[in-house]
Amino acid sequence: MAGRKLALKTIDWVAFGEIIPRNQKAVANSLKSWNETLTSRLATLPEKPPAIDWAYYKANVAKAGLVDDFEKKFNALKVPIPEDKYTAQVDAEEKEDVKSCAEFLTQSKTRIQEYEKELEKMRNIIPFDQMTIEDLNEVFPETKLDKKKYPYWPHRPIETL
């Protein structure tokens, strides 16, 4: 049963190797070797444990009630399978991450379009050696001096100089 559950959750090591940074390759290789070791150990185990031959032990054990007592206790023993608390949480976080990645992707595409417009604007400006002050002020409005607000030279606030 454990082997079947593990078979469903295999790791794509090629994709995992592409994602991790170079300085983490040693840790990833160690993780991969541990995973292979544990997977091979689990593969050697049978799916169901072998049945206990209680008749053999009753015939060979000197104390008569001891084997019956062990058999009762063994049959009464129930090993609880721990409940999976974290898969739902991880799945929810994964969905949230997918949404945030999609949102970031759309924002990035809009930024790229804005930057391409700015780049096209920069490519189409007059060369600086042929520009006049008016051309410069038109292309870069932040260079224009405000003579109405600051009538005296240098026509800008002294704090910004």
UniProtKB/Swiss-Prot annotation:
Swiss-Prot/TrEMBL keywords: Acetylation, CF(0), Hydrogen ion transport, Ion transport, Membrane, Mitochondrion, Mitochondrion inner membrane, Transport
Any single biological process term in GO: proton motive force-driven ATP synthesis
Residues where N6-succinyllysine is found: 78, 85, 95, 144, 149
Domain of life (superkingdom): Eukaryota
Gene3D superfamilies: 6.10.280.70
Primary subcellular site in the record, as a coarse category: mitochondrion
Quaternary structure note: Component of the ATP synthase complex composed at least of ATP5F1A/subunit alpha, ATP5F1B/subunit beta, ATP5MC1/subunit c (homooctomer), MT-ATP6/subunit a, MT-ATP8/subunit 8, ATP5ME/subunit e, ATP5MF/subunit f, ATP5MG/subunit g, ATP5MK/subunit k, ATP5MJ/subunit j, ATP5F1C/subunit gamma, ATP5F1D/subunit delta, ATP5F1E/subunit epsilon, ATP5PF/subunit F6, ATP5PB/subunit b, ATP5PD/subunit d, ATP5PO/subunit OSCP.
Function description: Subunit d, of the mitochondrial membrane ATP synthase complex (F(1)F(0) ATP synthase or Complex V) that produces ATP from ADP in the presence of a proton gradient across the membrane which is generated by electron transport complexes of the respiratory chain. ATP synthase complex consist of a soluble F(1) head domain - the catalytic core - and a membrane F(1) domain - the membrane proton channel. These two domains are linked by a central stalk rotating inside the F(1) region and a stationary peripheral stalk.
Family stated for the protein in its record: Belongs to the ATPase d subunit family.
Protein name: ATP synthase peripheral stalk subunit d, mitochondrial
Gene that produces this protein: ATP5PD
